[in-house]
C-alpha cells in the first residue's frame, strides 16, 4: 500500500500507481454513525478484511471518524494484490544459485593507477555537468542505537561532534568544489534526494533547517516519504494496533522506487538533466557520497546498475552476498538467512576466495532510465518480502508479517550489473547497534574513521602524538578539507597533531 505521499519541497496528488483510493477522507466526519458506512463495509468485505470493524461498537464518534479515514486512505486493491502475490511466492522453487562471474567484478588489486585517474576525471566531468544526483535512504529511526531520532541525526562521537547527516553533506560540498575546479570553475550543485518515513520526516526536515542545511543550498535538497503498508496476520488479515487504528510499518528501503514514482521525482530528475543516481544508506560513517571514481567506472562500463562490494570478513559473517540466479541469469542479492550453511564455506579453487564472497553494503549506482524501469516493474510484480515480527496490537503483541521491498530487489531487473570492490576499512563503517554490542557500533565506526584519517595525515607528511594508545584514538579530517586524503600535504607536512582532534585547515 502506498499512502498519499508527503514531499518536502515537492508536492504530489499521487497515491501510488495501479490502484483506486476508496472515497475521500474529508467526508469521514459525516459518516461516523451507528454502523460503518455501507460502501466501506462492502469494500473491505470483498477483500476479506471486515474484521477491521470488529470493535466498532466500543468506539467513540471521534474514534470512528479516525478509523474511517484510516481505512479510506488505503488502496485496498493494490494491498490485496501484494498480500496474495507475496503469500503465493513462499515456497516457490527459485532458480539455481551460482557465484558471480569473476568478469563482473572490478577488484581492487587489478586496477591500475591510470584507470583510477581516468575514472576519477570522468566522474568529476559528469558531476560538473549536472549528470549525477544523490539518493539517500533515511527512513529508519535509531531505535537500536537507543534513540528515537532519525539515524542521520546521530553523532558517533568524532572530535567534531558531527552527525552522519553533516558528514555526508560536507562530502557533497567537497565534491562540488572538486568538480568545479576540474571544469574551469563551473559550479553545478549536486541534487540530494532524501527518503524519509512517516516516523522520521518531520524530525529530519527540522534537523536540516536548524543546521542551515550544513552549508548546502536549501533548494538542492528534496525530502520525500516512503510509504507504509498494513501489518498482516499469518492468514493475511489486517492487524489492528488499537480498536480504531491499523498497525502499519514502512514498506522497506525498496519502497524508494514506488515513492520516487508517485512523488514524480523521476520526472524531476529528468528535468534537471540527471542521468545517474548514487544511492546509499544513511548508517555508514565512511560512505563516499557522489564518489567520482565509482561514477566514472559506472559510465565507462556502460551498465544499467552497479554496486560497491566488500569481501566477506569470514564465512559466517551475517551479510547478504551477490549471486547469479540461474545459469546466465541476472545478478541478485542473497540474504544470509537464505544461504545454506554449506554454501558459506565453499571455496573457489582458482582464486582461493570464498565462492560467495561479494557482500552487499548498500552502495549502488543506477541510470535514471533503469530507475524508471524498476519503479514500474516492482509495482507490477507486487511480490514483497515477508518479515515475521511481533506486531503491537489490541491483543498485546501478535506474531504477524511486515511487508517490505528491499533496495537490492532492483538488480533482478537489470540487463547489466557491474560490481566494484572497495576496502571496508576505507568505505564501510556501519552504525547499526548501540555501544556495548559486539559489532557495527558508534564506537567501532568512529575508530574506523579516525584510523583512516590518521593514515591520510601520516601519508601527507604529518605526525601524531597521543596520550592514549593510538589504536583507540586518531585524528579526524574534515570532509571540507579532503574527500579521500587528497590535498593534505600543504596542511600536514611537518606538522604535529595531538589525537584526538579535527583537522579543518
Predicted regions and their residues:
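Intrinsically disordered, low-complexity regions enriched in glycine and serine
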Residues: 14-22
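N-terminal glycine-rich phosphate-binding loop and ensuing alpha1 helix
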Residues: 22, 27-219, 230-233, 239-258, ...
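Structural beta-sheet core signal
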Residues: 134-136, 194, 223, 279, ...
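An acidic- and aromatic-residue-enriched active-site/binding cleft used to recognize and process polar
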Residues: 137-141, 150, 158-159, 197-200, ...
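Residues at the starts of beta-strands that form the adenosine-phosphate
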Residues: 191-192, 220, 304, 416
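Conserved beta-loop-beta/alpha segment of the NTase-like Rossmann-fold superfamily
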Residues: 212-214, 218-317
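Catalytic core of tubulin tyrosine ligase-like
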Residues: 269, 273-278, 286-290, 295-475
Amino acid at each position: 500500500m502506498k499512502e498519499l505521499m508527503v514531499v518536502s519541497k515537492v508536492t504530489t496528488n499521487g497515491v501510488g500507481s495501479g490502484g483506486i483510493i476508496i472515497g475521500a477522507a474529508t467526508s469521514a466526519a459525516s459518516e461516523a454513525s451507528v454502523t460503518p458506512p455501507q460502501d466501506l463495509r462492502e469494500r473491505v468485505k470483498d477483500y476479506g478484511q471486515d474484521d477491521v470493524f470488529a470493535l466498532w461498537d466500543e468506539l467513540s464518534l471521534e474514534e470512528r471518524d479516525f478509523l474511517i479515514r484510516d481505512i479510506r486512505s488505503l488502496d485496498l486493491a493494490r494491498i490485496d494484490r501484494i498480500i496474495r502475490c507475496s503469500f503465493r511466492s513462499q515456497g516457490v522453487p527459485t532458480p539455481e544459485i551460482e557465484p558471480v562471474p569473476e568478469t563482473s567484478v572490478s577488484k581492487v588489486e587489478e586496477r591500475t593507477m591510470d584507470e583510477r585517474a581516468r575514472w576519477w576525471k570522468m566522474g568529476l566531468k559528469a558531476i560538473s555537468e549536472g549528470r549525477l544526483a544523490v539518493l539517500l535512504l533515511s527512513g529508519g529511526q535509531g531505535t537500536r542505537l537507543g534513540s528515537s531520532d532519525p539515524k542521520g541525526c546521530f553523532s558517533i562521537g568524532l572530535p567534531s561532534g558531527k552527525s552522519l547527516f553533516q558528514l555526508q553533506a560536507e562530502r557533497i560540498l567537497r565534491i562540488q568544489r572538486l568538480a568545479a575546479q576540474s571544469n574551469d570553475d563551473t559550479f553545478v550543485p549536486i541534487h540530494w534526494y532524501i527518503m524519509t518515513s512517516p516516523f522520521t520526516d518531520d524530525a529530519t526536515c527540522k534537523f536540516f533547517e536548524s543546521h542551515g542545511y550544513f552549508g548546502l543550498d536549501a533548494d538542492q535538497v528534496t525530502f520525500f516519504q516512503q510509504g507504509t503498508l498494513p501489518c498482516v496476520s499469518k492468514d493475511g488479515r489486517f492487524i489492528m494496533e488499537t480498536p480504531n487504528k491499523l498497525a502499519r510499518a514502512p514498506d522497506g528501503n525498496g519502497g524508494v522506487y514506488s515513492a520516487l514514482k508517485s512523488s514524480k521525482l523521476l520526472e524531476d530528475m529528468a528535468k534537471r538533466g540527471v542521468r545517474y543516481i548514487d544511492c546509499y544508506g544513511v548508517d555508514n560513517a565512511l560512505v563516499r557520497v557522489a564518489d567520482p571514481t565509482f561514477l566514472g567506472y559506472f559510465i565507462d562500463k556502460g551498465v544499467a546498475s552497479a554496486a560497491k562490494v566488500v569481501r566477506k570478513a569470514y564465512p559466517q559473517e551475517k551479510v547478504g552476498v551477490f549471486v547469479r540466479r540461474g545459469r546466465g541469469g541476472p545478478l541478485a542479492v542473497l540474504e544470509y538467512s537464505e544461504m545454506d550453511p554449506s554454501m558459506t564455506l565453499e571455496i573457489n579453487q582458482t582464486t582461493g576466495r570464498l565462492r560467495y564472497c561479494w557482500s552487499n553494503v548498500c552502495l549502488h549506482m543506477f541510470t535514471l532510465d533503469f530507475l524508471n524501469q524498476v519503479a514500474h516493474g516492482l509495482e507490477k510484480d507486487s511480490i514483497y518480502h515477508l518479515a515475521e515480527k511481533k506486531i503491537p496490537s489490541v491483543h498485546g503483541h501478535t506474531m504477524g508479517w511486515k511487508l517490505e521491498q528491499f533496495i537490492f530487489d532492483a538488480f533482478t531487473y537489470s540487463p547489466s550489473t557491474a560490481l566494484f570492490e572497495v576496502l571496508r576499512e576505507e568505505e564501510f563503517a556501519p552504525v547499526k547497534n548501540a555501544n556495548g554490542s559486539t559489532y557495527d557500533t558508534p564506537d567501532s565506526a568512529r575508530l574506523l574513521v579516525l584510523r583512516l584519517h590518521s593514515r591520510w595525515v601520516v601519508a601527507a607528511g604529518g605526525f601524531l602524538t597521543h596520550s592514549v594508545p593510538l589504536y583507540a584514538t586518531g585524528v579526524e579530517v574534515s570532509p571540507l578539507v579532503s574527500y579521500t586524503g587528497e590535498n593534505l600535504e600543504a596542511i600536514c607536512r611537518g606538522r604535529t597533531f595531538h589525537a584526538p582532534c579535527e583537522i579543518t585547515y
